[in-house]
């Protein structure tokens, strides 16, 4: 499959999508720690060494305590490194959220290797930080593409 971005701008380019993999979980993860805790995960076996991975994490809910900010990042457990983005979500008067986290990961990946990505979470203070919901489905999608 090819996707062509043809807006006429200099940053527009074509991209080739190689594969899409998806995982689902009905688990609830407690990330009420000031160090990162792994939560939902998804694995992909790459088809090309020229690939990037677009990783989309969609927890069905996020519950935070009133005295904390939640920090969320992507961990590549195969290589033991993290992506560049760290999302910070403030309590801001409501502890119930429904975020979508999108990470673009393209750090030295090798065709034929299987990479496992985890959404990790932590808190600024040790307070409630629950990702997911028992019985409801959260998902993680990885799109392998060449740009």
Task: Walk through the language-model features, giving the residues of each.
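Terminal beta-strand-rich extracellular "head" domains
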Residues: 23-32, 43-147
């Amino acid at each position: 499959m090819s996707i062509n971005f043809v807006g006429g701008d200099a940053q527009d380019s074509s991209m080739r999508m190689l594969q899409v993999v998806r995982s689902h979980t009905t688990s609830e993860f407690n990330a009420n720690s000031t160090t990162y805790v792994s939560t939902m995960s998804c694995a992909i076996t790459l088809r090309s060494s020229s690939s990037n991975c677009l990783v989309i994490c969609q927890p069905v809910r996020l519950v935070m305590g009133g005295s904390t900010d939640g920090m969320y990042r992507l961990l590549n457990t195969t290589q033991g490194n993290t992506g560049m983005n760290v999302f910070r979500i403030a309590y801001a008067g409501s502890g119930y959220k429904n975020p979508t986290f999108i990470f673009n990961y393209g750090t030295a990946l090798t065709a034929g290797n299987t990479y496992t990505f985890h959404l990790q979470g932590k808190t600024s203070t040790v307070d409630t930080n629950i990702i997911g919901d028992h019985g409801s489905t959260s998902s993680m999608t990885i799109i392998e593409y060449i740009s």
